[in-house]
A protein has these predicted regions:
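Class I S-adenosyl-L-methionine-dependent methyltransferase catalytic core
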Residues: 1-243
């Protein structure tokens, strides 16, 4: 991939908003049976920041997932410190401190702390004790990179909130690879020629959430925001689910 393309990709990442967990839970409950035995890919999702990763990690056993894969950048600007790369085998301290792209692959989430529940502490334990659970990526972690495309090919279902400015390109890749997906996009995407064509051809549809209900997203510190809830800055965005 050309340097100019990589630069554009990094710039486009700044338009990403982080979905709140209750919104993910409310939509995913309609698809529970479809996740059993499946490999789920969250390929725009740093677990430090992403509630998509958090949802599927917390519900790994409940949903009966076979595998959960997330590709992302180390470090966090939103949900700092819930998972810590320091001490993870194969990750140098310099990589843990920098925004080094990496892949997390989860195939088992036991109750490691014996408290009867699955929580992020269990996932953190997995990352620090299973050498094949986390590996650094060769590229920048962009969903269009060769290694990330290969991961999408291997996945059964893709679930994420891609950058809105790259929505057309993201959906085009999903359709080209004939992937099942549940993603979030701007409501205006319905009017895009390419997206409207996919909707008309039954290649995708909107989700269960009422289209009249907009969504509130967590935003980084440098963004304008409308209110603070639970210590997080949130902003009202015209968005909906696509599947």
């Amino acid at each position: 991939m050309a340097t100019s393309t990589l630069t554009k990709a990094r710039q486009n990442k700044t338009d990403e908003f982080y979905t709140q967990l209750p919104d993910i839970e409310a939509e995913m409950r309609h698809y529970r049976d479809q996740f059993k035995g499946k490999s789920v890919l969250c390929n725009c999702d740093d677990p430090f920041e992403s509630n998509f990763f958090k949802y599927f990690a917390l519900n790994f056993n409940f949903l009966g997932l076979r595998k959960l894969v997330a590709t992302c950048y180390a470090g966090s600007s939103v949900m700092q410190g819930e998972l810590d790369l320091f001490g993870v085998p194969g990750v140098a301290e310099s990589d843990a401190r920098a925004k080094t792209p990496y892949k997390i692959e989860i195939t088992e989430v036991p109750d490691a702390n014996a408290d009867g529940a699955t929580d992020l502490a269990d996932v953190a334990h997995l990352l620090k004790n299973r050498r094949n659970a986390l590996s650094l990526l060769n590229g920048d972690g962009d969903f269009r990179s060769r290694e990330c495309v290969e991961l999408m090919k291997q996945a059964d279902i893709v679930a994420t909130n891609p950058p809105f400015s790259l929505f057309r390109e993201y959906v085009a890749q999903l359709i080209a690879l004939d992937k099942k997906f549940i993603i979030i996009g701007n409501k205006n995407a319905i009017t895009y020629r390419e997206i409207f064509s996919h909707l008309a051809n039954n290649q995708m549809r909107t989700g269960y959430r009422n289209l009249n209900d907009d969504m509130w997203f967590i935003v980084p510190d440098q963004y304008d925001y409308e209110k603070i809830e639970s210590g997080k800055r949130i902003k009202h965005i015209m968005a909906c689910w696509f599947t």
